Amino acid sequence: MWLPKIRELIEAIKAIIKGPYTSKFPNQGHTPHPNFRGQPKFNEEKCVGCGGCKEVCPVEAIDYLDINDKLNPRRVITHYTDTCIFCGQCEAACIADCEGIKLSNDWELSFFDRNKANEQIEKELQLCEICNEVIACRDHLNWIIGRLGELSFSNPTLYLTRLKSLGIVDENIRSALAHQGCSDRSDRVKILCARCRRETTLTTTGTSKL
C-alpha cells in the first residue's frame, strides 16, 4: 500500500533535481520541429502568380482578384489563415520549385482582428494590347519563357514580354487602323490574348492590295 506513495515521492525528488517534464511556455518560446507544418507564407520574389495553389487548396483558403486597371493592372493573391488546414498542397503544387509559397514554423496564430490573419501579395498583370483582357501575370510569362528557352520565339506574346522586361520594346506602337476600330495583321506582333491573336491572324483587313 505504501509502494505507490514511495514511487510518487521518488518522482517528486527527481523533478526537484532535474526540473519539470513540461515545457516552460509561455515564459520561454517554443521551437517546433523542422518538419512542423505551420502557416503557409508567400515568397513574393519567387511566386509567379499562376494561381496553382488556389486550384489545389481543398478548403479554398487561397483566392485571387484580378484588378484590370490600365495604369496598374495587378493580381491580388490572398491566403486566409483562419480557413487553412496546413495540408501543404499549395507548396507541393507550386510550379516555382515549391518556393512561391512554403509552410513555415509559425504556429502561434491568435488574432483579435480576423482580417489580420490574412496574407496578401500583388503580382503585375499582362493585359492584351488590343482588348485589355487579362493574359497572365508577367512573372508567369517570364517563367514560361525560361522553361521553353529558344522555343518561346515562336510565340509573339512570349518573346515580346521578354523584350519588354529588358526595356527594348517601343510602348508607343499602335495599329495603323486603330482609328477605324479594327485590327490589322500587323497587330500580330503584339502581346495579345488568344481571341485577338486569332482575329489578327485570320483578318484580311489591309491585305487587299497585296
Named regions from a protein language model:
Residues 1-68, 72, 81-83, 89-92, ...:
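Non-ligating segments of multi-cofactor redox enzymes
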Residues 75:
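Phosphate/diphosphate ligand-binding glycine-rich loop within oxidoreductases
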